[in-house]
């Protein structure tokens, strides 16, 4: 392989990593660890976090299982079409790995799962149900799935992610310790915080799909309000409200200034990234790396703040 080919292949690596949704899996694990520490619960074992990772990767790859024949300029769709066979085998292998991991998980914790209370089952079930309704089905529900309700889409994604990374780690601890799941005010605050943060990221991500959503009459906030109004009247005010609420919470609970500073970094970056969307059109990788990357930044900052300050 010549030098130019090696360099070209190197430039493709970020696309492979982000288009394959492994980055989402990494973010889900990192946010789960952060939420456990912030709620002062023990970290779960490797198998738990592996299931979080592999399930997230598989879920986000679901829309691309079928090779599309429609004309498209979407880089991610084009990438999946180009690497269709590779990703098909990737899906099969991941599904097999997930099945084996679930068997091992149930082998260790099957008795605990069987003893779950009705309340625990309800909490466990609500987030996968909402996640399934987001995609719908190709038979009857696909025509009316939640994904087609443009303004609702960010809230559905934010709710599902908040449940996965905030509720599930604590729920799992309550199950294996044979305790009733009873989230405190800290847990509720963190759920709302993660819900709002990820919802704002989803609204920013809709900027990328403005032309397509407008064509297919997907009434997202960006389509309804326009880019400038979405940023100025929605993203910036909500980002500032989230930042203000955290600072108020942190000061009333006597957080150290270092801890407060670390946890404000993700909100400040979110506001700056939202403003950057006004300047010029951004490529898809910008949204995958920079916008979605704020989830990882939030997790890292929150984890460092809890461990060392």
Q: What would you call each of these model-derived segments?
A:
Residues 36, 40, 63, 67, ...:
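Membrane-water interface at transmembrane helix exits
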Residues 29, 33, 52-69, 127-135, ...:
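Central hydrophobic cores of alpha-helical transmembrane segments in multi-pass inner-membrane proteins
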Residues 91-139, 235-282:
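Transmembrane helix-loop-helix
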Residues 30-51, 103-121, 166-192, 247-258, ...:
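Helix-coil boundary and interhelical linker segments in multi-pass alpha-helical membrane proteins
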Residues 52-74, 197-222:
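Acidic (Asp/Glu-rich) catalytic motifs at the cytosolic membrane interface
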């Amino acid at each position: 392989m010549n030098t130019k080919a090696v360099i070209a292949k190197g430039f493709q690596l970020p696309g492979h990593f982000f288009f394959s949704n492994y980055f989402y899996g990494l973010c889900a694990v990192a946010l789960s660890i952060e939420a456990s520490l912030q709620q002062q619960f023990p970290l779960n074992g490797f198998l738990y976090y592996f299931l979080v990772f592999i399930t997230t990767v598989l879920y986000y790859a679901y829309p691309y299982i079928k090779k599309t024949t429609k004309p498209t300029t979407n880089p991610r769709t084009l990438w999946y079409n180009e690497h269709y066979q590779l990703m098909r085998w990737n899906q099969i292998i991941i599904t097999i790995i997930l099945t084996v991991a679930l068997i091992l998980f149930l082998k260790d914790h099957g008795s605990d799962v069987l003893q779950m209370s009705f309340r625990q089952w309800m909490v466990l079930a609500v987030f996968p149900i909402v996640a399934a309704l987001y995609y719908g089905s190709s038979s009857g529900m696909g025509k009316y799935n939640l994904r087609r309700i443009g303004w609702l889409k960010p809230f559905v994604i934010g709710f599902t992610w908040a449940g996965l990374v905030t509720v599930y780690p604590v729920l799992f601890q309550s199950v294996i310790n044979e305790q009733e799941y009873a989230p405190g005010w800290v847990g509720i605050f963190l759920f709302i915080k993660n819900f709002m943060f990820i919802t704002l990221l989803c609204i920013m991500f809709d900027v990328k799909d403005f032309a397509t959503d407008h064509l297919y009459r997907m009434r997202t906030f960006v389509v309804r309000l326009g880019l400038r109004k979405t940023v100025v009247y929605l993203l910036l005010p909500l980002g500032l409200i989230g930042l203000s609420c955290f600072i108020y919470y942190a000061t009333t609970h006597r957080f150290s200034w270092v801890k407060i500073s670390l946890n404000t970094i993700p909100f400040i970056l979110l506001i700056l990234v939202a403003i950057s969307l006004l300047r010029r059109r951004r490529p898809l990788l910008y949204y995958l790396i920079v916008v979605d990357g704020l989830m990882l930044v939030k997790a890292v900052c929150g984890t460092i703040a809890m461990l060392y300050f």
